[in-house]
Amino acid sequence: MYDINKYKKLAMGNLTDDMIPDIINEEWLKYALKNEIFRRWGFSFSDLSNKRFTGEFNDEIIRQVNYSTLTRFPEKNPFKFNTNYYKTTPDIDSVHKNGITGDGINIAVIDNGFVNTPTEIEGKIKNYYESYGSRGDHYHGEIVLSYLVGKNIGVVPNANVSFYDINPDYFESHPELVGDNPRALYGKLIYDRLVEIYNKNLSGENTQIVNISSGYAKASNLENEFAFIKEKLRETGCYVIDSDEFSKYFTTINTDLNNGTYYLSDWQQDNHALHESKVMVPSSEMVPLWGSDKDYMYHGNTSFSWSIPKVSGMFALALEVNPKLTFEDFAQIARETSVNNVINASGIIEKVKFDLENSMEL
């Protein structure tokens, strides 16, 4: 078959096009998935039109391989591209068709900045606040925004979004500012942004949700400071939805393009029961391909990063119906209305409406 030494090189080193053989089988994919670069990008930038896929391919392997609209596949391949993945899930689409799209809801997003703005979020950012006089350049922030307010996959497309760029790239070229713990600096940058949003709320800006899709507090040894500022923001009517708040009630789940079933990512397998006890949030659609204006990428192993903006978006939809709803009440309603433990946006909105109407009658 293949030279095992070449496999080892593939798993441990940088992936290059010449490492992709003319004949691709499942065994090769298993080794390729050991490569960090391949796990992140897969075939997203590959021309495979002259390659041949041979043998049987297990869905559990195929769904881990990322690809994009730039990928050129041969006619026969084990990947089933689904154009429905350019859209929100049917439950969210149903809410949008009923005219609930986040009008009047103010959301702040604190994340890695980006230079290129994909068409998915073009015109969707009301305010972009740069950090240290320039923009960061990373795919994370643009994908978070796409899930939140994107034209095709966004949960709450009409919300007013202010983006706070923490620009960690700046410190890569200024290592003297970092010290011994880069994560501590990262946490401090986020904390400073939360204080900034709090002060703006005191001045009447009325941000209702802050979306932070990356872990930070424990790594930066600022747990007490974050707990304090989050509580102060709550006093102004603003809820911070980060990995800590998200994981109290929710977890992330993938959708298999080949058969429409749900599955947990590899990193969740060690705590299967824990994740299945939470309300599951599907977040494995096509997302903007980093560096491209109009191309999209499929990723089969999702994370909290992508599910947090979906929950923030659904909470925003619920706030449009009942502006006094707390995040804790929203989470309880999400559990009560879930379908087979999977979050159901239309069910949430119906329940929020029902509860609001009943409270008015009392």
Tell what function each PLM region has.
Residues 2-103, 119:
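Protease zymogen maturation seam
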Residues 2-15, 102, 167-255, 297-309:
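Substrate-binding/access-modulating region of protease and related hydrolase catalytic domains
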Residues 93-107, 112-126, 132-187, 205-206, ...:
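Subtilisin-like serine protease catalytic core
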Residues 99, 113-118, 122-125, 148-152, ...:
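Sec/Tat-exported extracytoplasmic proteins
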Residues 111, 236-320, 324:
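Extracellular S/T/G-rich loop segment that most often corresponds to the catalytic His/Ser-adjacent loop
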Residues 115-116, 154, 167-170, 216, ...:
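Active-site/binding-pocket entry motifs
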Residues 144, 210, 314:
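Terminal peptide-recognition signature
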Residues 204-211, 320-362:
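C-terminal subdomain of the subtilisin-like protease fold in secreted/lumenal serine endopeptidases
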